[in-house]
Amino acid sequence: MENYGDIKTIRKRKRYLKRLYRQCQNQIELETIGWSLIANIELLHYYTHLGNFSVTGDIGRILNECAVLIRDIKYKKLNGILRQDEPYMDENYLSFLMSLANYVADGNLQRFESQIGNSFDRTSAMNGAKHFYAFLQDEAISPVAEQILSDTSSIYFCECRNKKDHLGSTFFDYIFHKPYICILEHHDLRDLFTLIRECALGVKFYMKEDLHCDSFQKVCAYVMEELAFSYFETNETHREDIELLKKQRESDFTGYANDTLMQIHSLPGQQNLKSFFHPNVNEILKVIPRQLKKDLVEIQAYVMARGLVQQIQFNKELGLEHLKTLMRMNISNEQRPDFEKIGLGDDVLLTLAQEMSMRSKNVYSRYHEKKR
């Protein structure tokens, strides 16, 4: 039986890191320890909040909320000191990101909730993820993915208690030099693709162990998920369920883009600016909060992933090389990021977003025709 990560180990690491943090006098080392401490606290937060309490109903909810509140109070100050970075933004970049989001949001406004039919256990998810990364046959990615997936003590499985809960997260420990993967189990095919996606973030961590995670780190996760969809479809594995998952992904980002744009367009009214009904980019830039900037960049990351998948499908060696270049890239928050050298300039991304919008509409049209 596999020895997966458990809550006792998280708490033991947290106590050790907390002691290190209190004793440390070196500012650089203090930041490294601080990020690792946050990673373990967030992992504990995630693991406890979702899977530790066996009590259900209102009492279980109250216990969860109390545990989260207490833990938040304990590390809120530390979290605030370290998490100060935000994506670079100027008028031109904001205008570009909003255009990109508009295309993605135009895909289809209807929310889609997938119903995955076949059951899937942990062993099947682990084996499937290993087979996929071995199939990739990349000398930089495949061995690291195998290393991550073989270290089961750093993989945490939590029971899903709410259908609205997200699927997984990865936390980075710079003291123990390890990524911790947490999977919210649905006991179906989603667990496999969540594991593949989170493992990709672990690979990026080993390629470039950077304290300040850039806003584009999830590109590699989206790329691996898309490649995995194609791999398992080609092998005639759960094709109907995979088709549902792909529709779900389209739906999620269409909704995400719509929600982001709605919040952005409501900002001038909230700030009592004059141009409430027709805000310009300059006015939005003055009031847009850090989280909405991150949301816009996340949409760009999703479009970039689609572009890299197309590159890999056309020329596997070149496409994977571009992906690895991105994974190792130093992306500054002091200037606008430039992805021309990996074939993802602004014009390319806008064209990709338009194509995604049209494909999304066609997918939904065919889906509803089948249901009639």
Where are the predicted features?
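N-terminal helix-rich structural modules
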Residues: 1-92
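Active-site recognition of the HExxH zinc-binding catalytic motif
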Residues: 183-209, 218-221, 226
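Inter-helical turn/loop segments and adjacent helix faces that build the functional surface
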Residues: 77-84, 139, 143, 206-211, ...
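Contiguous, non-catalytic segments that form substrate-binding/exosite surfaces or channel walls
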Residues: 50-179
